[in-house]
Amino acid sequence: MASSSKVFKKTSSNGKLSIYLGKRDFMDHVDTVEPIDGVVLVDPEYLKGRKMFVILTCAFRYGRDDLDVIGLTFRKDLYVLTQQVVPAESNSPQGPLTVLQERLLHKLGENAYPFTLQMVANLPCSVTLQPGPEDSGKACGVDFEVKSFCAENLEEKVSKRDSVRLVVRKVQFAPMEPGPGPWAQTIRRFLLSVQPLQLQAWMDKEVHYHGEPISVNVSINNSTSKVIKKIKISVDQITDVVLYSLDKYTKTVFIQEFTETIAANSSFTQSFSVTPLLSANCRRQGLALDGKLKHEDTNLASSTIVRPGMNKELLGILVSYKVRVNLMVSCGGILGDLTASDVGVELPLTLIHPKPSQETTSSEDIVIEEFARQEDGGEEKQKALAEEGDEGS
């Protein structure tokens, strides 16, 4: 049985325009970004000699939509790329068609038109700040949207009903040649102890994938007269909002205490496994997530990989992680643990998706996943329509 290729379809409210995309996640290779290849199907009676455009917009949203009615704008367009699809402009010729575009054009007929949008490399990736329970409307963050409409020119005002919009994501994946794992050390001296306490921590590799257990190796050389009662390991997410302010948010996405007693004048080495997950932080307001598509699960935001020389302000939101290893050192005496000292180190953590395997487009079947608007709330709902071969074209 031949495998089938999934295609995402979105139709305008007036039913006259449809966008077809082979995927909604587009890979950022740091130096280049995958092009957005698709097809637009238009009713010829609706087109009526007008022009048809496809526009890609990257926007940074940092406020609620309902505040726009009082004259406050909380959305900034970071990048807009426009392509005139009908009639095609001679100064922007269409490159070679992809296999999927050829299949769609054959299936949809003469009223279907291909388009290719090649965004620049210095744009942010899709990031969403997790809203609180009382928040409504679109979440704050960076999003990408593909929009198509028919008009006499770009200045003509087009209603939402007469246009079709589909949200896509720009995502980064793990580098092909990651560097060595991070390592950190601290030495602490205590009063009345001749020798110091030495703490070392390291990870076996630089890059870790979402949902993958992270091995944190801890080595302690306790040459003091103190007793170590606990080892605490935590993972912090640091979010820098650099576009309109210098806000920085640090949220602990994993924390666990390990009861390990390390006596005076002794050594200790052990590997601990930690796994930061969104499922354990699903109600944390302001947590950075990978850009969310409706009806699909997401995860903690991936670490931002910055190309050398890139203007960080253009990235809107920068996300990084660190692993903290802390020792609770008992000072003894009458107060015991109440006067315990905290000795710790920090390790940088790169949390990201593995690079997906190359997908090949089937020459046989196309499965179309259509997004239709609900009558009451205008939200998208999703239904899968299997259209095999050329049936129904």
Swiss-Prot record:
One of its GO terms (molecular function) is G protein-coupled receptor binding. Pfam families: Arrestin_C (PF02752), Arrestin_N (PF00339). Gene3D superfamilies: 2.60.40.640, 2.60.40.840. Its main location: other. Residues 371-393 are annotated as: Disordered. The keyword Disulfide bond applies. GO terms for biological process: G protein-coupled receptor internalization; signal transduction; visual perception. May play a role in an as yet undefined retina-specific signal transduction. Could bind to photoactivated-phosphorylated red/green opsins. Homodimer; disulfide-linked in response to retinal illumination. Interacts with CXCR4; the interaction is dependent on the C-terminal phosphorylation of CXCR4 and modulates the calcium ion mobilization activity of CXCR4. This is Arrestin-C. The lineage of its organism: Eukaryota, Metazoa, Chordata, Craniata, Vertebrata. The gene is ARR3.
